[in-house]
């Protein structure tokens, strides 16, 4: 028994299947993402007339204009008194801007617009009305014999209006004249409503939309041989009963039933696997053979293969049986896939002509059940049969498939070697053109590896012939073969860019095609080096609070305010120090620093002062740290020198005070005023300097109160002394120190911070210094460490923080620290929990000049072998030699990325230096949302000799999925 199965369990897709027992022979799928437009009626206007095509283009409200040929234009739109016997000229018939009522005859396909017609067809249950085509009046071609004679008599009895055509459908067989006249009256009302609606509005707009898949299925597929209609959705069941009554098919109401089984409807009738075969290229035959279906722009090719088929006594019989079996499957697949247009079938060669005739007749007999019009030819001497099938709607592949972006629908791609050689030839062609400055090639990683390794000599030869020009090859992991992009940069069309994480890279206008959000991440923005608090409040809120209290006037700091009145001179001095001294002597001359810079490794540590976001008593100038005099003799850090054993020694100048980095642990809780100040005097104190941004603790060897007034600053550095014994025993002295302390030759605007949340302000030339107890919690971060290149380039905002936690005492080092590092910036967790572990200790005696005693004092130096853990990657670092000047509270501070502990730098072999292009592939983390890439042009400028003989500086970034085209 034949059934109509309607599956509506998924609201995005509604499927209608026609089955004969458990064999699927027709399928219609309607999806919410692909709405059918065929048979829709629009009011459009002519936008362009093409006499060469004898057609016009119609704007009917869609993106692509419709195509209307002259043969599809009704005479109702011809001018009056036009002589149709003369050769027609489309410009004499129609004009631009003229409005027409059109119907979609063929839907859009690829780049082609929809095919339109002015011959409107209104399909009903029993007949089809053509209101503006009087030439057509007849009966469906499927009706034969006595039924056809009977319908002709009924057709002559129908009252058809003038200048209208009519076709009686197969469903009209056996119906009375009254039923046919009732259906005709409905179609006439429909046409009158369309004409009335078209006059209310100007073109373009939609007048009538074709019914949904359920109505179309009832109208087109319902025949008397359909035994039952099963629907698995109660809501669709009610809608189906309403539509079938409106269509005038009350005889099918009792056949509509609700399916309530536990097994899905299509699975129960075992048709899911048959539906899947309609999406496959290869379809198996029961005997073991197969058919291959390939659709192209011009036609659909179907190839028949015997495969494992062994049916038949000889090869001729096997070929005949396989072809006969394939004919039935081909006719079914044409209906399931809804393939239209030209179809070519390649049969297995048969020498017997009678077998060929049987195959042709079998195919003609089977396709009679198809609703589409089909024309079939004969099998040629090459074994090919040509046939055409009417396009009823978009095929299953067009509505549910999309073209592969990699192979563009061909199914094959070019191999890597052939593609690489083709790109190399294109690079050479572009490089040898006149006025060429650079040639950029953005290629997949596989192609880049081949060009930079196998063809490095060829790339270098191209650069030589280019007379100084560069060839930049950029691997892009988001690009897959066979896609690539080769662009030529002319000398007069240079655009500065920060692409590929290189400086001074220039790109042409193709750069504008890259996605905007990716470009913004790579663009260098002017910003300042800021310190962000690790508080619960947002950064914007903290910034607002900071600006609020900075606006408040502090009358206690008039001397400091006077100093900062001349801002230009002060900041020019700071900029001059950075540009002339630090960049010249540290970056350029020091090979270790240059290496680390080009590898984006932050190896030099600097502690940045803390920002007090909630202090009202301290003026803006108080919260800044003044710099000391720029004296080269007092450098805190000299060049890093190499030893024969590949160890690095942290050496200080003899005239510089020996200091050690100490822990700052700001407390959140408010401490009593007297206790706070007393703890400050008893314990170690901290000083912050902005020139080198190092945090130091100063201690005197003298511990007597009588020497206090005689202490003076040495080497232009602020001094302070801990008087533990005297303070503990002299209570009167404690009280006195709560308010002022004698202090000589202090530098202005230096802030002393105690571990108990007390801030001390040093006054210039005042012989005393004050402190301000904080009555609220200070929102402070731990000790902030910044790399040297960030200090020199204030446009960068990336920073990191290090928090120290006490661990057990190990060997001779007291309070050795475990260092945990993390970025302050939110969403910028680049390295998490990098740990510096002590593994090996050795000692040796080193004599140095003591700070305040004339005699010399021996100190100990320790060696550490360290290991950093970056997530799952472990990197071993070379040994570091650090001088410790105190046995108490000395800590080793480390950065999150190798710091001073750079990898062991072996001696450079200049003789065997390769001239190959240098390729650097960076991680996605450098393109994180909040990170600002700094411009390293100054570093590249100082190291031109390193890349002078290379084939080009190469780098890989994930800046875009570049368009695949060649730029001129």
Curated annotation (Swiss-Prot):
Region of interest: Disordered: 947-968
Polar residues biased stretches: 955-968
Key words, A-Z: Cell inner membrane, Cell membrane, Cytoplasm, Endonuclease, Hydrolase, Magnesium, Membrane, Metal-binding, Nuclease, RNA-binding, rRNA processing, rRNA-binding, tRNA processing, tRNA-binding, Zinc
Annotated membrane topology: Peripheral membrane protein
Subcellular location(s) of the protein: Cytoplasm; Cell inner membrane
Segments forming domain S1 motif: 39-119
GO biological process, one term: tRNA processing
Protein task: Endoribonuclease that plays a central role in RNA processing and decay. Required for the maturation of 5S and 16S rRNAs and the majority of tRNAs. Also involved in the degradation of most mRNAs.
NCBIfam families linked: PRK10811.1, RNaseEG
Domain of life: Bacteria
UniProt record similarity statement: Belongs to the RNase E/G family. RNase E subfamily.
This protein's encoding gene: rne
Cited SMART domains: S1
Full protein name: Ribonuclease E
Main location: cytoplasm
Binding site for Zn(2+): 404, 407
